[in-house]
Amino acid sequence: MFSDTRPVLAVLGTVGDLSQAAGPELIEGAPPDLPSPEECVRVVPSGTFPPPFMGHVDLRLHPDDAAFATGRQSGKPLMRGWFRLPEDEPADSLALLCAVDAFPPTAFNARLPIAWTPTVELTAHIRANPAPGWLRCRFSTRFVSSGFLEEDGEVWDSAGRLVGQSRQLALVPQG
């Protein structure tokens, strides 16, 4: 993608048939512990934030992680919550790609400025086709340095299986 003559987006994709994936498994993590979706804070677009596309998904933030919206950053660079398509439409691999980039930046809870956090690189791994129902998501940051931060994401399906992972490198928001 170009803006005038300047490249602003490059995409590389590798695709395969997940139904043919087989092999040993070792899972050292677990789905995030979340209150029910009804007890979480629904993200609804208004103005420029959250962005208008959020009206096309159902995203619910853990109450502890949603407090940034009222000026109470937790100090922990963490975002957890539920994700699904509208009207409980079944999620597919494209929905998983949307889920890994739909949550607010973890920087919003890190006592950094709440501002544009531009993505430099986003890598997403689709590990399995998700079971029907809500997806549990967790995004965390361990390192903020030299003007960059990384955000690692996990997406778990209603059967408790890891179905997606992501790593996003972003610029630290400037206030």
Regions found by a protein language model. Name each.
Residues 1-175:
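Terminal targeting signals and extreme-terminal segments of soluble enzymes
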